[in-house]
C-alpha cells in the first residue's frame, strides 16, 4: 500500500511539473513561459544574443531577471538530470531558434520524446541524450529528421543493443553530424564473429 502511494505521488508530481504553462504564456508570451518551465525543473538556458545563462540552483531557486527578456527566444537549453518528459516538451515547442538541447541523464526521456524533436528540425544543431535509460534503438531512428544536427551525444544508453551497428546507422542517417558514443564496446569484429557463428549453426 505504501509503495503504491509513493508511486502514485511520484507520478502525480511528474505530471504537475510537466504541465503546459498556458497561464504564464497568456500573460508573458511563449518565450518567458518556456524559460519559466526550464527553471522550474532546475534546468538552465541562454537567450538568443545573450551570453548570460539563467540557471536554478540545487534547491530550485533562481533569479527572476529572465522576465526582463520578453519576446526573446531561447537558443540553448540544458535540461540534464531533470524530469522533463514527452508532455513537458510542449512548453518548448515554440522555441524555433533552439540550437542546443542537453538532456543528459533524464530518466523520463524516451523514444516518444525523441519522435517529437522533429519540431526543431530547422534549428537544432547540438543534442545530448547520453545516459538516458529509457531510450532504445528504435527511438534513435526518429533523429533522422534533424538534418541540421552537427553534434550528437549518445553515450552510455543502456537500452541500446548492438551499439557498434547503431552508431554506423546513425552516421549514415546524419552524415554531417559528429557523433559521440562513449561507454560501449565498439568491437564490430565480435559482432561479425557472432553472426558467422549463428550462420554456421543454421547450416
Identify the residue ranges that each predicted region occupies.
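Long, contiguous C-terminal flanking segments immediately downstream of a protein's structured core
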Residues: 2-20, 24-30, 41, 74, ...
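LRR N-terminal entry segment and analogous cap-like coil->beta motifs
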Residues: 10-27, 32-115
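Concave beta-strand-loop units of leucine-rich repeat
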Residues: 19, 77-84, 97, 103-109, ...
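The leucine-rich repeat
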Residues: 84-88, 93, 109-113, 135-141, ...
Amino acid at each position: 500500500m505504501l509503495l503504491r502511494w509513493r508511486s502514485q505521488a511520484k507520478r502525480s508530481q511528474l505530471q504537475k511539473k510537466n504541465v503546459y504553462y498556458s497561464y504564464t504564456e497568456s500573460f508573458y508570451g511563449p518565450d518567458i513561459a518556456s524559460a519559466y518551465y526550464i527553471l522550474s525543473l532546475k534546468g538552465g538556458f541562454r537567450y538568443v544574443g545573450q551570453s548570460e545563462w539563467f540557471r536554478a540552483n540545487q534547491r530550485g531557486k533562481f533569479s527572476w531577471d529572465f522576465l526582463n527578456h520578453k519576446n526573446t527566444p531561447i537558443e540553448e537549453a540544458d535540461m540534464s538530470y531533470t524530469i522533463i518528459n514527452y508532455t513537458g516538451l510542449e512548453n518548448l515547442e515554440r522555441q524555433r531558434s533552439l540550437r542546443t538541447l542537453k538532456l543528459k541523464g533524464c530518466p523520463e526521456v524516451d523514444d516518444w520524446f525523441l519522435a517529437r524533436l522533429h519540431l526543431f528540425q530547422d534549428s537544432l544543431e547540438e543534442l545530448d541524450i547520453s545516459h538516458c535509460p529509457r531510450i532504445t534503438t528504435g527511438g534513435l531512428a526518429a533523429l533522422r529528421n534533424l538534418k541540421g544536427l552537427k553534434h550528437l551525444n549518445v553515450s552510455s544508453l543502456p537500452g541500446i543493443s548492438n551499439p557498434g551497428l547503431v552508431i554506423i546507422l546513425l552516421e549514415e542517417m546524419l552524415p554531417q553530424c559528429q557523433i559521440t558514443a562513449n561507454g560501449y564496446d565498439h568491437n564490430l569484429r565480435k559482432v561479425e564473429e557472432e553472426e558467422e557463428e549463428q550462420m554456421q549453426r543454421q547450416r
